[in-house]
Amino acid sequence: MEKVDDTLSRTYVNHRSTKLFFASFAALFFELLVIRYLSTEIRVFAYLKNLPLLACFLGIGVGMIYGRRNKVERLFPWDALALFAIIRFAPMLHLTHVGFPDSTYYRLGGQEFAVLAALLKLTTHRWLAIYLMLAIYLIVTIGVLSLITATFVTIGGFVGEYLKIFDPLRGYGINLAGSLAGIVVFTFLAFLATPPVVWVLLGFLLLVPFLWRKPVVIAVFICIVLMHLGPGKNTFWSPYYRIDFAALTPPAGSARTSAYRLSVNHDYHQWALDLSPEFMSKHPNAEPNHYALATYEIPYSLVSNPTSVLVVGAGTGNDVAAALRHGAGHVDAVEIDPVILQLGRKYHPEHPYDSPRVSIHVDDARAFFSKTANKYDLIVFGFLDSQTLFSSFSSLRLDDYVYTLQSLQSARRLMKPGGTMVLSFAGVPFVNQRIFAMLEAAFGHPPVALKTGFAGSGISFIEGATQDRARTLPFPDISDSLHWPNPTIATDSWPFLYLDHRTIPVSLLMLLVVIVLGTNRLLKSSLGVGWTSNTEYRQMFFLGAAFMLLETKGITQLSLQIGRAHV
C-alpha cells in the first residue's frame, strides 16, 4: 500500500512539475512574442520596448501573487483577443505611426508626421494639435500596456499556482528551466524567419492544458490564430523586422523587373535596383533607377578599380553591385539581417551576391570591425538607418553602436594608406551635424559633405585621400553648414545618435510617471499594499529597478563584445 501511495505521490509531483515548466515556458514565450510583434505594428513601441517588458513583468508578478482566480480567467480570453486584434490590425486602425508628442519626436522623422499634418488640418493652433497628439499617444500606449498587463496576470497565475506547491529552490529551478526553454524556442522561431501566425499558434497551444475545459476560451484562441493567417506572400519576418518586398512596374519596353521596394515595419527602407550600363543605356529615365544612380556612383568617382572594398550595411546589394561594376577586385559585404540578404541574393536584378568576388558576412558591423584583419582601399557605409532595437531588453536602435566615435575609429583602422571612406546618410540636420563632428574627431580633420538628396535628405560624407577630388563632383558641398559648435558626439558610453542632446524625452517621462503611479494603485487595490507601504516593499521596488538597469547594461555591453547579431 505504501508503494502505491509513493507512486501516486510521485505521479502527482511530476504532473505538477510539468505544469509549472510549461506555464513558465508560456510566460517567457508570450513575453518575447508580444514585445517582438508589437514593435513592428505600432512604431512607438519599437523605441519603448522596455515598457512592454515591464508590463509583462507586472502582469506575471501580480498573477503569481494572485494565483488562479475565476474572475481573472473569465476576462483572460477577451483581454488576449483585444490585445492581439489591436496589434494585428494596427495599420487599419491608423495606430502604426502614432508618434512622440515632444521635440525629440519631431527630430525622429518618418511617416509619424502624417499624424501631425492630419491634426493641423483640424485646427490652426499648433499647440492644440500637439496636445491632441499627446492625448492619442497616452491613450494608445497606456491602453496597450494595460491590456498586456491584464493578459499576463492570468499567465502569471498559472505559474504561481504550481510554484507554491514546491519548496522555493526546486520550484524556482523548474520555473527557470521553463523560462529558458521559452526564450530558446522563440529565438529559434525568429531565426527561422517564421511569421506571427506560428508564434501565436504555438503560444496558445502551450496554454491549452490549463484551459482545455473551457470551450469559450479555446474558441477565442482559434479566432486569434485565424485572424493572423496572411498577410501575404510578399511579407517576410526576419529576426529584426517585418519586411514587405514588392516589385515595381518595369519601364516601357522592358520585359523584366528592374526595381524592387523593400519596406521594414511599414516604412520604406531601400530599393533593389538595376543600375547596370546595359539597362541604363536602354532606359536612361527609368525611375527610381535614374534618381539613385548618381549616389551609388560617388565612391567610384573617387576610387577607380579598387582592389578591396568593404560595404557596411550591404542590404539587398546596390552598393555591392556598384563595386563590381567598377572593377573591384574583392568585396566584403556586411549585413546584419539575413532575410534582407536572402532577398537581395534572390531578386536583385544584377545578382551581385552571386559573384565569386564577393564575400558575404551576416554580422554586426562593429563585430566585423573587431574580427577582420583585412585592409581596404575603399570603405562604403550604406544607408544603415535602423527602425528597430537590437534587443527586447534595451532601448538602443539596431544601428546606434555603428554610428559612434569608437566605431568610426575602428573603421578608419581598416583603411589602407591612401584609402577612402564614404558614409551615406539621410537624416535630420542635427543628426547630419553629429555625424560630421564624429568623422572630424575620428580622422582629425573635417569630412567633405556632398548633398545628394537621395532618400530626401541624403548626404555623402567623404574622408581619406580623395577629398580634393570629391569637391569637384557635381553635388553641392555643404561641409561649412554642418560645423556644429560644441557638438554632442555619440560614443560607446552615450550611443544615442537620434537624441539631439543628453536628455530623457518628456513623452517617456510622462509614461513612466503614469506607470509608477498606476502600478502602485493596482497593487493597493488588488493586494492591499503598494511599493511605498513599508520599508521592505520600498527595498524590493529599488531592487527591481536595479535588476532592470543591470539587465539592460549587460545586454548592451554584450552587444559590443560579440555583436548584436548574436545577442
Language model: regions and residue ranges:
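Alpha-helical transmembrane segments of multi-pass membrane proteins
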Residues: 1-566
